[in-house]
Amino acid sequence: MRAVQLQSAPRKQINFFPSLTACIRLLVLASLILSPQLGVSAQPERPVTLAVLDFGNTAIGRLASEKVMANLKQETDLMILDRDQSRAAARGAGYAGSLNLSLNEARNLGAVLGCDFLILGDAQTIRRSPSTGPAYFDSYASMFLVSARSGRLVGWERPNFNAPTAVASETALLAALSNEEVRHRYAGSIQRAVENEQGERRLIIDQQTPVIEAAPDDDKSAEAEGLRLPRPYRRLAPAYPETAARAEAEAMVDVLVDLDMNGEVTRVEVARWAGFGLDQATVATVRQLHFFPAMRNGVAIPIRVLLRYNFHKPAK
């Protein structure tokens, strides 16, 4: 291997003691460059705000929401909004306790409350008399975590406890809502939702998503525009999941569906959520559908349609 000799350049005299004026200029320049950066780094991040509304008008509903609120207040990254103010704002907006909201309804409610996320719920104690065995009391709390920014249902759960007396079942429920695991689960869900929404916003900015025409509300309006609406080859009904059966849930699920020029489903978004596994059942069913494509003046076009599914608890 050939050795390469590096030749050093002639040495130059360097003055390590610049003038006082030059030092002052350097210090001023450095302060101007660093001060905005220091201001940004020193500025604390705004905590995520959360509103917890009453879980119905019953005594156990108010107690359950109080327990959840007190539990989540221990999370330093969350700022829990005043309960009385949130209640008054929700009532002023006409919210009556529905757990079956559209994205717009949920966003509007969140805007009225002035929060990033909100927890809606319904808690009750019901006396049940089975055909076999003694009667018992069932205490449950259906809780929905909703993003105020997107209006989406982030997650739901329905803890329930059975006991021979109402006091015993309610005590077990309230103890569960005060559990550390519940607190960490909600904090984790909120953090993931924040990160996902930030990622979606960056994706929207980076990508140029093609605009898809929304279908008119009815065939008459479509015909006036020279448009033939898409039709499914065959209609499929979503299954009524066991999670919904246990809650005896009845609700409506709306989904926005993007169809390409071949009538194939390219995207499904829940526009009205219901929880209890009904949203997932609906999306899974819609993804199996195939359509005769939408036509405008005899030419196939991509289109966005709204599909609605009504769920009823099965007859016993």
Language-model features and meaning:
Residues M1-A22:
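N-terminal secretory signal peptides that target proteins for export/translocation
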Residues D84, W156-P159, E269, R304:
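Short hydrophobic alpha-helix segments
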Residues T49, V167, H184-K316:
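Charge-biased low-complexity segments
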Residues E66, I80-P130, Y136-F137:
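Short, solvent-exposed, polar/charged sequence segments at loop or secondary-structure edges
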Residues A42-A51, I60-E66, N71, L109-V112, ...:
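C-terminal/domain-edge helix-coil "capping" segments
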Residues N57-S65, L99-L103, V112, P134-S139, ...:
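Solvent-exposed, acidic/flexible segments
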Residues E45-L50, L63, K67, E75, ...:
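Extracytoplasmic
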Residues C23-P36:
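Bacterial N-terminal signal peptides
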